[in-house]
């Protein structure tokens, strides 16, 4: 519940509208295993906030800032924005962190189906 409260407050502090909602969430992402489970959940909550209350006007940078705020303030965790950006954009991504207020990113063309792997993270 604290993470959702942090997301709502973070969205408001970044100039976005919020409101109440009910959500049932189920996942196979392993919690606390270093696989961006919190960032994945944060991006889901941002998508809900964006779609239902902000006419889908939030950027991936906005999503990442809101998620970072929630982790920094409500979990007292020194979180950056990389996990949030990676989850928001999806797929292989190249980041440029030169301007931390407006991260730049490029989606990479990565033909994973041509690799002889069972699991690719």
Regions found by a protein language model. Give the residues of each.
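ATP-dependent small-molecule kinase catalytic core of the GHMP/sugar-kinase superfamily
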Residues: 51-121
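Anion-binding (especially nucleotide phosphate/pyrophosphate-binding) glycine-rich loop
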Residues: 1-66
């Amino acid at each position: 519940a604290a993470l959702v409260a942090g997301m709502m407050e973070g969205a408001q502090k970044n100039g976005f509208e919020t409101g109440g909602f009910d959500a049932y969430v189920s996942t196979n992402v392993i919690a606390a295993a270093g696989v961006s489970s919190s960032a994945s959940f944060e991006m889901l909550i941002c998508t809900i906030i964006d779609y239902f209350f902000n006419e889908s006007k939030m950027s991936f940078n906005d999503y990442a800032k809101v998620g970072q705020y929630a982790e920094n303030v409500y979990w007292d965790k020194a979180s950056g924005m990389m996990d949030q950006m990676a989850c928001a954009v999806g797929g292989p991504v190249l980041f440029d962190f030169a301007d931390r207020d407006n991260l730049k990113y490029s989606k990479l063309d990565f033909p994973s189906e041509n690799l002889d792997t069972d699991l690719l993270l």
